Structure formats: structure tokens, C-alpha cells
A protein has these predicted regions:
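Conserved metal-binding segment of the jelly-roll/cupin
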Residues: 125-146
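A short, N-terminal "cap"/entry segment at the start of jelly-roll beta-barrel domains
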Residues: 20-88
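An anionic, turn-rich surface loop/hairpin at beta-sheet edges
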Residues: 111-131
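Short, conserved beta-strand element in jelly-roll/cupin
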Residues: 92-113
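A short hydrophobic beta-strand segment most commonly corresponding to one strand
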Residues: 146-159
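Positively charged n-region of N-terminal signal peptides that target proteins for export
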Residues: 1-5
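Bacterial N-terminal signal peptides
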Residues: 8-19
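His/acidic/aromatic-lined binding-pocket segments of jelly-roll/cupin-type domains
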Residues: 89, 95-99, 123-124, 132
């Protein structure tokens, strides 16, 4: 119930921001990223569960890490699928939400980022149904996964 309300609040915020967002790109995996939709400013855009499942299946088949479902300049909705690990990173101005759909992984956040590794961060296992909020300036990374799929929402920047 809380997760449903949180997702609804985030989706509503995305719709409100759409009217004010500027076009743009950026983010992880930009060179290999596929963009499905530009965010409409004059109507809602629905992405049913069947659409998301098909997107994740296509990503697995093509070995894609990130697909940008909605591009809105100052925000975006992405599907992400990681196998193994990815380099730790930190964003100056981006706020992130993760909504885990499938698989498990070790997520580390906080601490300091030095030479591509997080030192002094907090590790925990994330699993389907978990929601993670990562504010700007917080190092984060995923490791130890046989495969994790999650929705990733970016707000506030393009770094």
C-alpha cells in the first residue's frame, strides 16, 4: 500500500514536472541507451505492466543495461538490468529512485568514492518490491548479482 502510494506520488510529480522540463539527455550508458518516449506535456502516458515486462525481456535478449522509457530533460524514467556489477558513481545534481522488480543484488551507498570504489558505505541486499532513494552527492553502486531489473527515476539534473 505504501509502495503503491509512493509510486503514485512519484508518477504524479513526473507529470507535473513535464510541463516545465527542458529537452535533454545524459545519464549512465548514454552512448548505448535506447529512448522510447519523449515526455508529453499535454497528456498522460501510460506504461502498463505488460509493457514493462516486455521491455525487460527485450533488454535481456539484447544485453542492454539501460533503456530510457521517458525522457523529460530534468527527469527521466529508465529500465535498468544489471548482471554482475557496475562501477560505483556519484551524481552532483541528480536525485534517484530505484524500484526493484526482479532479482537481487548488493547495493552500497554513502561513504566516499575513491578510485572507482566506495569506502565506508552501507551495504545491503535489495530484492523485488524494495524502493531506494539516493540523493545528490551520495556514492552508490550495485554488485554481486546474477541479474537485477529495476525502474530508475532521475530528477533534478543531467550529470
Amino acid at each position: 500500500m505504501i509502495r503503491t502510494r509512493l509510486f503514485g506520488a512519484v508518477a504524479l510529480t513526473l507529470c507535473a514536472v513535464a510541463a516545465f522540463a527542458q529537452a535533454g539527455g545524459g545519464g549512465r550508458g548514454a552512448a548505448a541507451r535506447v529512448t522510447r518516449h519523449q515526455a508529453p506535456a499535454d497528456k498522460a502516458l501510460d506504461l502498463p505492466d505488460a509493457t514493462l515486462k516486455a521491455e525487460f525481456a527485450e533488454m535481456a535478449a539484447q544485453k542492454l543495461i539501460t533503456t530510457r522509457l521517458i525522457e523529460g530533460g530534468a527527469y527521466s524514467l529508465n529500465t535498468r538490468r544489471i548482471v554482475g556489477s557496475e562501477p560505483a558513481q556519484v551524481h552532483k545534481s541528480i536525485i534517484e529512485f530505484y524500484f526493484v522488480r526482479e532479482g537481487t543484488a548488493t547495493l552500497i551507498t554513502g561513504g566516499t568514492l575513491a578510485e572507482g570504489k566506495i569506502r565506508g558505505g552501507v551495504e545491503r541486499v535489495v530484492k523485488p518490491g524494495d524502493v531506494v532513494f539516493i540523493p545528490p552527492g551520495i556514492p552508490h553502486g550495485i554488485s554481486n548479482t546474477a541479474g537485477i531489473s529495476y525502474l530508475n527515476i532521475h530528477f533534478g539534473g543531467t550529470d
